[in-house]
Amino acid sequence: MSWRSNAQRTGMNAQPLQGARRWGGAGGAGEGPSSSGSPPSSYHQPSHPYQSSYSHQSQPYNAAPAPPTSSSSSSSNPRDAALAAAAAVAASIGIKRDRDRSSDAPGSNSYAAPSLLTSASTADGSGADAGPRKRKSRWGDANDKITIPTAIGANVSAQELDKYAIQVRLDEISRKLRSGDFVPPDRERSPSPPPTYDNQGRRTNTREVRYRKKLEDERVALVDRQLKLDPNFRPPSDYHAIKRNQRPTEKVYLPIKEFPEIKFFGLLVGPRGNTLKTMERQSGAKISIRGKGSVKTGKGKMDADEDEEEMHCVVTADDEASVKKCIKLINQVIETAASTPEGENDHKRNQLRELAALNGTLRDDENQLCKNCGNKGHRAFECPEQRNWTAHIICHRCGGQGHLARDCTQGRAGAFNGAPPGAAGTGNRQFDSEYANLMAELGEPAAAVDGAATAAGGAVGGAAVGPDGKKIPPWRNPEVWSQPGFGAPRGGDAGRGGWGHRGGYNNRGDRAGYNQHQQQQHPHAYHQQQQAYPAYDQSAPTAAPGGAENADQQHRDYSAEWAAYYAAQAAAGGAQGADPSAAAAGTTAAAEGAVDYSKEWEEYYRMQAAAAAQDGSAYAAGTQA
């Protein structure tokens, strides 16, 4: 019968092995026969080598060897060998327990060997659960406790000392708050403040409340300091709740009564609340405006206490530094509004600018680039570097700067359309004459305008001042009428009527001349005039080129002709049914010595003839060329 393992035995052959091997033992009972079919001989080896080797391994490093037990006898009973092995294992466990206990005691460096009594008790099984055993694991003990050392070494830094002192004080405060023993003795207490009560009539500042709050505030401050020193510090469980309920709060009252015309609410809130949000973001605090006028009527409901107070700002933050910074920002806005006029307040100007940008009505002139220099802050017409284009304009007639040739007020080099050179500067003389007339009408003496009169009429030769010393009006002064270039256009028919029988002062050519007008209205009188004055034909052809010189040399008196002319005009008017009273009035006025302008008219027509002759000579020269 071959040897099989216990798991392979079935049926009738399922019998227990004789001397089955156990953990910590050396074999089975050993009463079975030692015939063929027995297990290998190694199961019946004496247990002395194994027992002795395990005993040696279980001994501590500096402990004495265990004394021999009863199982180390020369008996070959397997049961005794198993009991001896179990006793050895129990002894090793006891040795480990003793070693752990001895390690907890300070100054112990050796381990005591177990006694025979301990070995015997463990062998009997009565000492297996003799005491509580510490549960060990690879992650450490189940209830590790970190204690504060009571001894301070010499090489400890100042930061470590602060951390140690703060931790000791925190433990002391926590113990007092848990036990309720936080009220000091009578000799150590300070005088009590006046009592305060809430809305229900309960006192809010009792001795217990005051000292508890004092300790809680101190603990919160110490925890904040400890967190700064040691980021790994774990604050107490109720720290966050206490700090949330004890956030520092301050009130800043607005000077509404002192400055009733200033809107502090708008200056603090800003457009759509952006100013208030900016201050909260900069300081890290929360700002709430409370009091009278802070809430519109019907928009919200305030507490009774807040409604009775003046308008103020409630500043709340996590720490005192944030509260102080926020209060400083609020005071800056108040001081600026109280000390600066409204038109010069940059804070309000920026708010209005921001509001316009939010509404989409901003005209950004400050950020707009100047088209002249490319800088910001001004427009092109306000540019300080703008080039003076007017100073670079040069007149090609007079050579002056700042005006064009068409706007030139100086004398021209040549006459327009062949005018004589002597007619240059008539424009200036005309302006001077008008100025002199204005001064004369204002009552200035003749001597004051003598220079102007001389400048106005001296060049042409006409008298600018009458015999009585008064200035001749411009409509009566022939020198004013004689403008340069007054004559026929190129290729036209020249004549005393000017521009092809469409003459007249300041005539643009769209009205008939004097002769044509007289022919159309008074044909009978015109024929009579032609018969009476054959030598002075107003519709005569163009004079010879030398006519101008002859006219200048001759000084004929045309007073008789003018008298006959006026008589013929009066007769013609009477023949056509004119009013006899008007004719009589005219005759009476002439008889009474009315002012006679015959010489002025004579001079006027003389100049017209000279101008016409000059134009005719220029035209003839151009035709021959």
Curated annotation (Swiss-Prot):
GO terms for biological process: mRNA cis splicing, via spliceosome; regulation of mRNA splicing, via spliceosome. Residues 177-190 have a biased composition (Basic and acidic residues). One of its GO terms (molecular function) is zinc ion binding. InterPro entries: BBP-like, KH_1_KHDC4/BBP-like, KH_dom, KH_dom_type_1_sf, SF1-HH, SF1-HH_sf, Znf_CCHC, Znf_CCHC_sf. A zinc finger (CCHC-type) spans 368-385, 393-410. The keyword Cell membrane does not apply. Coiled coil: none annotated. Residues 22-31, 488-503 have a biased composition (Gly residues). Residues 253-330 form the KH domain. One of its GO terms (cellular component) is cytosol. Residues 1-154, 177-206, 466-533 are annotated as: Disordered. It comes from the Eukaryota. Residues 32-61, 70-91, 110-130, 516-533 have a biased composition (Low complexity). The keyword Lipid metabolism does not apply. Residues 1-16 have a biased composition (Polar residues). Belongs to the BBP/SF1 family. This is Branchpoint-bridging protein. It comes from Mycosarcoma maydis (Corn smut fungus).
